[in-house]
Amino acid sequence: ASLVGYNYLKSSQNDSAFADAVGAGDGTKASGSIDIYNMSFGITYPTAFSGLPITKYNALDNGVKTLRSGKGAIYVKSAGNYFDWNSSPRYCGPNGAISDYMSCADAGNGRLASTPYVIVVGALNASGTKTSYSSPGSSLWVSGFGGEYGTTNPAIMTTDQSSCSQGYVRSGLASSNLFNNQGNHSENSSCNYDSKFNGTSSAAPTVSGVIALMLEANSSLTWRDVKHILATTSVQVDASRTKTLSGVLQYAWVTNAASHKFHNWYGFGKVNAAAAVDAAKSYTANSLGTW
């Protein structure tokens, strides 16, 4: 497998740049041969809900219809990190308290999440339940590990820019996380690793990695097959999680018309890599019919 980087946020972020980023442009900046597009970026809240502009929708529509020889590109999107604010009041429920368990934003406010072409990913902590920040909503498909902030609770370990002269872990940048502190830790003396990677931007690529394993096991899978396998093999977590506010049931696991369990915090649940790959091996590709 190969990795290709495209810094959409560094671009003009116009429709043409987006089309290039998702493989539906002229191919000069993002090759149409890419299988999985991980989109770890989001919008700034607060914001009103609005639909995806038609030009961006068409770019995704083209991607799922023509890329991967017609099997469709796989688009994976981070849900967002706005369950609470980094300001006062921090929490957005009627009592302004964490015990309200009411998010300050909905993942569906991110316009890309409003399309069926995108796999929206929420973030789990090291205990396998929702992180403190992960944005919920009916647009979530599955959840992957994103970690907390790497100080009192674990985050995700990842590579950093090499050497102590650049990157998140570098000389002159003190950190309360000893592993990340300027190369002073014996196991990170060259500052090549960062143990504070987090956010749904961290969770999304863990799911992209699972999808890569699925396509390695069965390269004939369509984009819809991938979504179906993830939905049917993911694991229910935090099973008793429920909350009623002002007489309205806000959060609980429900069983949909297809007999799949779903929760606005978790989507269809925690991705199970082994089960997803096993299912992919024997899956009859393109067997879901038209839609």
Model-derived segments and spans:
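Proline-centered loop/turn at the N-terminus of a beta-strand
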Residues: 2, 35, 72-75, 119, ...
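Substrate-binding/access-modulating region of protease and related hydrolase catalytic domains
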Residues: 5-115, 127-129, 187-206, 217-220, ...
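C-terminal subdomain of the subtilisin-like protease fold in secreted/lumenal serine endopeptidases
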Residues: 29-40, 117-118, 184-197, 216-291
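A structural signal for well-ordered alpha-helical segments within the folded catalytic domains
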Residues: 54, 58, 140, 204-212, ...
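Outer-envelope exported proteins of Gram-negative bacteria
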Residues: 74-78, 143, 227-231
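Short aromatic-enriched loop/helix-cap "lid" or pocket-rim segments at secondary-structure transitions
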Residues: 87-91, 133-134, 241-244
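Extracellular S/T/G-rich loop segment that most often corresponds to the catalytic His/Ser-adjacent loop
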Residues: 101-212, 216
